[in-house]
Amino acid sequence: MAAKIISAHELECLSAEGSVKIFDCRFALNDPDAGRAAYEGSHIPGAVYVDLEKDLSGPVTSGTGRHPLPDFAVWRETLLSLQINANSTVVLYDGGPGVFAARFWWMLGWAGIPDVMLLDGGFEEWRRQGLPLGTEEHSMDRGAVSGDTVSQVESAGYVNVDYLVTRLSASDPLVVDAREPERFSGRKEPLDKKAGCIPGAVNRHFALNLSKGKFKAPESLREEFMRLLDARSPETVVHSCGSGVTACHNLFAMELAGLSGSRLYPGSWSEWITDPERPIEVHEG
């Protein structure tokens, strides 16, 4: 799953050619309407708004996490309604860090869409550069899409909760948790009903992938992740977080660093804790 970034000025040039589809993924976990409101206030010209909970998640039930993957047939219909297919060139952005854009990136890879880029620095970088802003709302009208090829990629790496439960005792795979250290350790939990982490998990807050709001150089990311993996293969890594969103940022960063093959646990912590029989770990101090 290729990870590619694009600068604000590169996107401005590409957009002028008219051959790119741009999507605004801004969202706030503590205020689900904030992303659309921000989009309506101003956005990159031509961008279409995509909502984490309405477009990039399936129904929440008692046994799922907060942002479960949709059924693939539903996801395919969403992509067709957005006029995205395997021939599309797609650029994604959010407010800056890239966590919501990374979730969309992973889901596009799940559907076999290869040419997808994240705007480095997101909307904040675009605005900081003084580039044009738009206020007109854009949407894709449902219709026939040239080269309509959207299909589930069986090799798109993700695991379910049963896989993790059966592998925990062997410490295989290595679960990398993208939440901030206070949530990972169990010292605080503002979003979920229980605090702590999956036993044996290690912590890498997604913000460590960034420097001054942009992705670190691939060689720096590679060095940092190699230390975290401690001689393990990238294929042994499963990414988790609170609900399968910021985990995608770590997965993207590993791919950007040339460490390919890690997988996503979409349900993450918020799914893990739905069953009281599943063990949890709390780190004191």
Give the location of each predicted region.
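Cytosolic catalytic domains that perform sulfur/thiol-centered chemistry
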Residues: 1-285
